[in-house]
Amino acid sequence: LAEATGRADRFVGLHFFFHPAKNRLIEVIPAESSSQETVDKVVQYCKMLGKVVIVCSDRPGFVVNRFFVPWLNEACLLLQEGVASAAQIDAAACKAFRIGLGPFGLMNLTGPPIALHSTDYLAEQLATPRYDGAQNLRDLIEANAHWDISGDQDYTTEQYDVISERLFGVVFGVAAQIVEEGV
């Protein structure tokens, strides 16, 4: 894309997150040809928009989706294994990560097919099993359904420990991989 513009030194990719009017996070992805001046101006512009900026390399999933997608998938695996219900996993994830929306609520909001497409894309591009989409996510999409998160959100201490350890584990594992790759 940068070369097609005829001004490759002034080209930078931006990755906004859902919902861009509310989510303050943005990834800035310089091309190999991007000048430092261009990157600096784009970062400054994004900060003027009130965004929290992550500058990263042009790699599959950039930074955030590299750990966010397996985080969603790990939640699906926890459900598939019968560790807890979707509502309980969401509640435990919200507490552990101090966030307002759990993995199943988020997938319902953005659409489960987006989560599956992301897992399949990253699994193919990175050839890493942690990105292979969970079967229950595939089944949900086949049924053209959404996750049922209407149930009881109360979880046991044991459930919370398993959920939080598994979700943090996948995030930390991928974060280490990202650092190692220099993304």
Each language-model region and where it sits:
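N-terminal glycine-rich phosphate-binding loop for ADP-containing cofactors
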Residues: 1-183
